[in-house]
Swiss-Prot record:
It comes from Xanthobacter autotrophicus (strain ATCC BAA-1158 / Py2). The gene is rsmH. Keywords: Cytoplasm, Methyltransferase, rRNA processing, S-adenosyl-L-methionine, Transferase. One of its GO terms (cellular component) is cytoplasm. Its main location: cytoplasm. GO terms for biological process: rRNA base methylation. GO terms for molecular function: rRNA (cytosine-N4-)-methyltransferase activity. Its EC number is 2.1.1.199. S-adenosyl-L-methionine binds at G47, G48, Y49, D65, F92, D113, Q120. It catalyses: cytidine(1402) in 16S rRNA + S-adenosyl-L-methionine = N(4)-methylcytidine(1402) in 16S rRNA + S-adenosyl-L-homocysteine + H(+). InterPro entries: RsmH (IPR002903), SAM-dep_MeTrfase_MraW_recog (IPR023397), SAM-dependent_MTases_sf (IPR029063). This is Ribosomal RNA small subunit methyltransferase H. Specifically methylates the N4 position of cytidine in position 1402 (C1402) of 16S rRNA.
Amino acid sequence: MTTGHGVGPADAAGGPARHLPVMLAEVLAHLAPKDAGRYVDGTFGAGGYTRGILNAADCRVLAIDRDPTAIAAGADLVAEAAGRLTLVNDRFSRLDAVAQEHDFSPLDGVVLDIGVSSMQLDQAERGFSFRRDGPLDMRMGDTGPSAADLVATLDEVQLAHLIWSLGEERHSRPIARAIVKARDESPITRTAQLAEIVSRIVWQKPGEMHPATRTFQALRIAVNEELSELVQALVAAERALAPGGRLVVVTFHSLEDRIVKTFLSNRAKAPSASRHLPQAEGPEPAFRLVAKGVVEPGPDEVAGNPRARSAKLRAAERTNAPAHPGGDLMGLLPAPPPQRHGRRR
């Protein structure tokens, strides 16, 4: 989509478009960009949503990504946007603080695309893909422990818990056992090594996902603290949005969608009253649901962009009520792995 607002259909690196933003039409319909508006794209990636927002209205976008390579790749789009786009290398959990630091408040909209980008999957050296051999890294930024560090240091019980709670993998225990056995023989430092270990435990049936999908998902979420980041980002958006501002979130698996659904349901719920307490108590709704339930991609998009297959979109509009206390949502996160003492196994 190209309009008189001045950015074309190339990707964020300036070359031919290759990263297809998932559910772009639905995102723009629910975000409803307007002229002179301020919008945050909390997950810039290849810039698909940012470009769509800039094309939809004569507005400004503050785009955030914790991956410095994504920020570097977006330099051409910044130039093309002629002062309407600011890129920031940071975590989207800090979107309210980042907006204030750049004199970009209050916000008229926030969009979040939760999950690994196709750019990261395409780069074997980033260690996200079980289909391309590379170092077992999976870090979206350039700091903190890698997936190889977790595989090397967690014991069998902790590994099984991580793979089950963050990957929803029902074979988590035998997978963890196989990982521990394999690392006793030699360090597991490559994505192909780990994928092969898991593939010996989980058989792939025709038409089903790769056996290592859920294990890799669990490690990626743990390495990048993705669920905690998501909860904090939702709370940050609640604080930063102006009345009437829109929050649009696209998720790709049930753990993320459950958090977003629970958050929006909680924030859109009116205070309850009873015959014992006829005066309703509790905070006023901070959001009004724009999408009644979940929005999913159409069959044409799924056929043309397999990444869209599991996508789910939820959207809400900020009311003029004060933001709710942020600390009431940490119970949405899976329980941490048990602490073990003694010899690692």
